[in-house]
Amino acid sequence: MEKEKSLAKNIIIFAIGSFSSKLLQFLLIPFYTRVLTNSEYGTIDILQNIATLLIPIISLTISEAVFRFAMEESSDKEEILSIGILSSIVNIIIMSFIAIIIYQVTKYEYIVILVLYMATNIIRTIFSQFTRAIGKVKVYTFDNVLNVFITIVANILLLTVLHKGVTGYLLGYVIGNTVSIVVLLIAVKLYQKIRIKKFNAKTFRNMTKFSIPLIPNSICWWITNFTDRVMITTSYGTSINGIYAVAHKVPTIVTVIVEVFFQAWQISANKEFEKKEISKFYTDIFHYLFAFVFIICTVLMCMCKLITNIVVGSEFLEAWYYMPILLLGTAFFSMAQYLGSIYTASKNTKMAFVTNASVAILNIFLNIICLKYIGPIGAAIATAICYLILWLYRAIDTRKMVEICYDFKSIIVTVLLLIVNTIIITMEIKLWYLYSIILLALIVFINRKRIISFTRLAIGMIKEKIKIRGEA
């Protein structure tokens, strides 16, 4: 019970930061879809996806190693942070020289801002991960909110006052990241912890031994997550990709919730992995997460058309059509991601890569076929299928490390009901909203035991917190 309470406490802290920051971003969707054209939004989406691909390669995913190694009680925290920052600075300098050469050849207008976007992102991520690893979760949470707030204010000024378009949008992120870096340097006194003499070659090798296998893993994630957008842009242009990118905003609500969970879960998983009762811990948390994710995805499917009409600009109204299938894929992805945490906790990053690589190859193949014969929505279907296969693959493979006792009956029935709900809404079958509500009720009923159990745990924590404050 103590493990669950610790996890729940961390979830609450991370939720305050992530929900408030992501809510601000979500509320700005009407603004972005009105001041940016379909083409500009599509270009921004492609540039951010390019950055997502390149950042792990440039940084050697060292931020993951910083978090994992700094979590260990016996580790030299200053040494780990120094290695992470110094190695990243060297890599950023190399990247800048390469970017200069590329610019001289191509004269592509967005190269400079893209380099700044990636450089500030790399440094901020290392500082942020280190702050979380050493237990400064409140500072970590505050910084997340501040980062988003500054980014949004900068974006509003750059897009509406200065009319900088794509460059202004990305520059807003650069400004937000820079402010965040300065805040963490001061608040956690990171400037006192970074020392050149602390760079230890042996520790660096151990850290890169952990992080480098995550590079191809990240590339595979990129292929699985973003191949659809690249292929849509190639086949149908940036305008359709802009609509598809907006469609991803509703599934992002689920992603944010799951991200909050994983920020807390990584801490618990890394601490508890070697203990005997780990199997029951993983089993309980899996079923809590499963019930929650599938219920919230069903609710959002029912509301996707309403949300689209309220939130997005008139040029993007078609986005709702893609949302149910994207939500289905997000549900599968969330469960695959949970099982992927077992690889990180056990430091078995090789199998994380193998599972991702297999599905990434399949995703390319399916995207080519589905886009050709079904159209843009085929990309969403291909991605959902790949996430389902990744979940099943990992469910089988991770049993060698942690034996999770799955409630197969409730899982299979819930998955089938969500698939039926997706089909009903996408095809706009008559009275689809009524059928969707009935399916939601069935999913809640099937998972009622997990919901009740989790609710009791949450209420118990709240009562305990009130009691402690009363005694104080």
Predicted regions and their residues:
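Membrane-proximal transmembrane or re-entrant/amphipathic helices at the cytosolic face
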Residues: 404, 423-472
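Hydrophobic alpha-helical transmembrane segments
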Residues: 143-190, 358-362, 376-397
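Signature of the first transmembrane helix
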Residues: 4-63, 92, 96, 147-152, ...
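Transmembrane helical elements of multi-pass membrane transporters/channels
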Residues: 10-25, 147, 172-188, 201-270, ...
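N-terminal membrane topogenesis motif
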Residues: 1-24, 67, 75, 201-217, ...
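Helix-loop junctions and terminal segments of transmembrane helices
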Residues: 25, 58-74, 251-287, 340-345
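Interhelical loop/hinge segments that connect adjacent transmembrane helices in multipass membrane
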Residues: 1-3, 112, 166, 170-172, ...
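Alpha-helical transmembrane segments of multi-pass membrane transport and lipid-handling proteins
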Residues: 19, 56-58, 82-113, 182, ...
